[in-house]
UniProtKB/Swiss-Prot annotation:
Belongs to the SecA family. PROSITE patterns: SECA_MOTOR_DEAD. This is Protein translocase subunit SecA 2. It is a peripheral membrane protein. Part of the Sec protein translocase complex. Interacts with the SecYEG preprotein conducting channel. Has a central role in coupling the hydrolysis of ATP to the transfer of proteins into and across the cell membrane, serving as an ATP-driven molecular motor driving the stepwise translocation of polypeptide chains across the membrane. It comes from Mycolicibacterium vanbaalenii (strain DSM 7251 / JCM 13017 / BCRC 16820 / KCTC 9966 / NRRL B-24157 / PYR-1). It is an enzyme of class 7 (translocase). Keywords: ATP-binding, Cell membrane, Cytoplasm, Membrane, Nucleotide-binding, Protein transport, Translocase, Translocation, Transport.
Length: 850
């Protein structure tokens, strides 16, 4: 039908999607006449057809028609024509760009239903636990009506609950939960401890936020590393003694620092160190750099917050949300903790890691939806092989986007913002104010409080109330201050969100959905009718006032984020207005290298509080955003380039783990390991020498550290024409015979299952321990690889080459350690019945080794 939809031009693709929606419309009458039982039974019919060889593309019109009718019967919502188009775009593995308020969540129901019929599981990825739970409950009602099972992954869930959720036909959850579960599954010691069951099809909500904005930060599971806690406080003290532009320089645009000779001299003097850059002091250089970075580049209530428990929590720069469980790596988080004077938690070592790019590449088919994807279309195509299709709105957009108002200073800008908000609030027009940091949202909140303007604040410190705050943001007179785009996923409806207001009213009457579910459900319909009538009246008043007014207090470094803020106004054809207030002192302008800020300000001979209208300013803003967007893109592209190395290595290791957990007979693999390890020993003792010069006694001594050697070296190998190949085969055969004898004894004594379990446990333990050590080494390689550029080398090429060499070395170490551990373990198990001469050297204790 549309198997090659990605290759079509977008205009033609939209026509094709519209034709599919027309086909779905034509089937509406037929499904409307079905009883509830007949409608839900269509799922079993579709499953039988798939089992008989039908492909899902062929079932799309019928499947969508059934899901659409079910949504109407269960939710009272019938997907519009454009929502059906969006659903079809998702089914074919595209990003559906649908404007805010166009009903992306409902559009997702149809492709999720169709793909769940295949029985391999559908993952629907959201940006937070609240949305995952909400959508699993609301949209899940449609799927359950049609006979499908629905699960949700929430952060506090235990493994058994997660396993059950993944076993469902459709599973909702956040990108972090899906990604970290994948990593934990590949650290599991038993097959039954895993929770996921594969990666067939995923739909990513707010796909730009997840696959673009968060893609610079890899997901990492860490464990304790060597303790260097005392140094963090010491270097926080030293950083406080240092002066910017004297002891170090700061590049705010690139977010880097460089310590000067004066800075190094100060540190050496304070620590009593002769040369800070001697190899023995290398860790101290890292502490110094992190302390200065923490001081100059990471600011409280902007990049992070400190909660009431004294924890330093990272704030997502794009959404304003706290990144729960995330910590800066390589000692930076500890440096910030030391700067803030809170408890410094031990530095962690990477145990498992994956980038978001590489995690989502695991899926056989991937799709996404958002209101802002067009500007990143090339990145989606190049990295994720996803096309972007812009779905036309259901109703024309009538929102007015006003030109920016620019001031010379931040103080003048905020004065103007407050006056604008006060005036609109007095008129009753709802206002949504967007800020770029927690610090600025709280500053503005204080200014509004001084002017007695009632308002709500939505930032990283108040996310528990996120949905409720956003739901009431469109009410008459409402003023909402939001950090970046916290609250995405919940529509701001003029007059208020009826369902949220209904729930609020019921709770105020003492009715609760979990504590008194029967009374709550019984009262829901009547109260909702009351609330809906009130909301319609209020919505008409708000429309007359001009709709929702969105006010941005600063241009974001990405135009896409600005557009997301604008998109909160004017949903579904509603009127609305947006405007940005900007100052020449804003962070974006300071980070831009396109113009001289001081020179520009001196040229503008205007009063501080008078807005500026100059093309050079507008051009500077556009250039600054383009510059930062390009820098961020380069950073994400760099993550992909560097990540390819670990991704290939991770796949090899995880596939090997899976074979071990699935109980594959490792006899053949172990014999190969013996051959490889013994060959390495033989080559080391014979390479580059004549046969007469071979030191076979040294070879035997070396082999004796690996296994109980029976083989006796020939004192005159050259006399009988011994070749390296023959020698290698003799020793390999000796080692294999030694292991076979032990295995036979254990199997006779304890059974085949015990021996298989012993082999599996040893190989798994050796693989995991060497992989963890390898990740630790790769972290250090990545941290220092940039220095290769000073010698004219390409850091990426060097990282690939060094990373490959280190991985080969790791695999060799896994083999050697596995063989040594197998002989040690079997010797210990058989110790009571074996003569001492047959035991491996250094293994006298006959205890179970694991």
């Amino acid at each position: 039908m549309l198997a090659d939809v990605l290759r079509l031009g977008e205009a033609r693709t939209v026509k094709q999607l519209s034709a599919i929606a027309d086909h779905v419309d034509s089937l509406a009458r037929g499904v409307e006449n079905l009883t509830d039982a007949e409608l839900s039974s269509r799922t079993d019919v579709f499953r039988r057809r798939v089992a008989d060889g039908d492909v899902l593309d062929e079932l799309l019109p019928e499947g969508f028609a059934v899901a659409r009718e079910a949504a109407w019967r269960v939710l009272g919502l019938r997907p519009y024509h454009v929502q059906v188009m969006g659903g079809a775009a998702l089914h074919f593995g595209n990003i559906a760009e649908m404007m805010t308020g166009e009903g992306k969540t409902l559009a997702c129901v149809m492709p999720a239903y169709l793909n769940a019929i295949g029985g391999k599981g559908v993952h629907i990825v959201t940006v937070n636990d609240y949305l995952a739970g909400r959508d699993a409950e609301q949209m899940g009602r449609v799927h359950r009506f049609l006979g499908l099972t629905v699960g949700v992954i929430l952060s506090e869930m235990k493994p058994d609950e997660r396993r059950a959720a993944y076993a469902a036909d459709i599973t909702y959850g956040t990108n972090n939960e899906f990604g970290f579960d994948y990593l934990r599954d590949n650290m599991a010691g038993r097959l039954e401890d895993r929770v996921q069951r594969g990666h067939c099809y995923a739909i990513v909500d707010e796909v730009d936020s997840i696959l673009i904005d968060e893609a610079r930060t890899p997901m990492i599971i860490s464990g304790p590393a060597d303790d260097a806690t005392r140094w963090y406080a010491e270097f926080a003290r030293l950083a406080a003694l240092m002066t910017r532009d004297v002891h170090y320089e700061v590049d705010t645009r690139r977010r880097t620092i460089g310590v000067s000779e004066a800075g190094v001299a100060l540190v050496e003097d304070q620590l009593g160190v002769d040369n800070l850059y001697q190899v023995v002091h290398a860790p101290l250089v890292g502490h110094l750099n992190n302390a200065v970075r923490a001081k100059e580049l990471f600011h409280r209530d902007r990049e992070y917050i400190v909660n009431d428990d004294g924890e330093v929590l990272i704030v997502d720069e794009f959404t304003g949300r706290v990144l729960v469980g995330r910590r800066y790596n390589e000692g930076l988080h500890q440096a910030i903790e030391a700067k803030e004077g809170v408890e410094v938690k031990p530095e962690n070592q990477t145990l498992a890691t994956i980038t978001l790019q590489n995690y989502f590449r695991l899926y056989d088919r991937l799709a996404g939806m958002t209101g802002t994807a067009r500007s990143e279309a090339s990145e989606f195509r190049d990295i994720y092989r996803l096309g972007v299709i812009t779905i036309p709105p259901n109703r024309p957009v009538v929102r007015r986007d006003e030109v920016d108002v620019v001031y010379k200073t931040e103080s003048a800008k905020f004065d103007a913002v407050v006056e604008d908000v006060v005036g609109r609030h007095a008129a009753g027009q709802p206002v949504l104010i967007g800020t770029t940091s927690v610090e600025k949202s709280e500053y503005l909140s204080g200014r509004l409080t001084e002017r007695r303007v009632p308002h709500t604040v939505l930032n990283a410190k108040h996310l528990e109330q996120e949905a409720a705050i956003v739901a009431e943001g469109g009410r008459r007179g409402a003023v909402t201050v939001a950090t970046d785009m916290a609250g995405r996923g919940t529509d701001i409806m003029l007059g208020g969100n009826v369902d949220f207001l209904t729930d609020k009213r019921l709770r105020s009457r003492g009715l609760h959905p979990t504590r008194s579910p029967e009374e709550y459900d019984a009262a829901w319909a009547e109260v909702r009718r009351e609330v809906a009538a009130e909301s319609r009246t209020e919505a008409r008043e708000v429309v007359a006032l001009g709709g929702l007014y969105v006010l941005g207090t600063e241009r974001h470094e990405s135009r896409r984020i600005d557009n997301q803020l604008r998109g909160r106004s004017g949903r579904q054809g509603d009127p609305g207005e947006t405007r940005f207030y900007v100052s020449l002192c804003d962070e974006l302008m300071r980070r831009s290298a396109t113009f001289d800020l001081e020179k520009l300000m001196s040229r503008l001979k205007m009063p501080e509080r008078e807005p500026i209208e100059a093309k050079v300013v507008s051009r500077a803003i556009r250039n600054a955003q383009s510059q930062v967007e390009q820098a961020n893109f380069d950073m994400r592209r760099s993550v992909v380039k560097y990540g390819q190395v670990l991704d290939q290595q991770r796949r090899i290791v995880y596939q090997a783990r899976s074979r071990l957990l699935e109980g594959e007979d490792m006899q053949h693999q172990i014999f190969h390991m013996i051959g490889d390890v013994v060959t390495a020993y033989v080559n080391e003792c014979t390479a580059g020498r004549r046969t007469a010069d071979w030191d076979l006694e040294t070879l035997r001594a070396a082999l004796s550290t690996l296994y109980p050697v029976v083989w006796q070296p020939d004192p005159r190998p050259h006399m009988r024409g011994l070749t390296r190949s023959v020698l290698r085969h003799e020793v390999i055969a000796d080692a294999r015979r030694a292991l076979v004898r032990r295995k036979a004894a254990i199997e006779a004594r304890s059974g085949l299952r015990v021996m298989r379990e012993l082999e599996r446990a040893i190989l798994l333990d050796c693989l995991d321990s060497k992989w963890r050590a390898h990740l630790y080494e790769m972290d250090y390689l990545a941290a220092g690889i940039g220095m290769r550029a000073l010698a004219g080398a390409d850091p990426v090429v060097e990282y690939h080459r060094e990373g490959h060499r280190m991985f080969v070395r790791m695999l060799e170490a896994v083999k050697e350690q596995s063989i040594r551990s197998l002989f040690d373990a079997t010797t210990r198990m058989l110790a009571p019945i074996m003569p001492s001469a047959a035991r491996s050297p250094g293994t006298p204790d006959p205890r179970w080794p694991f």
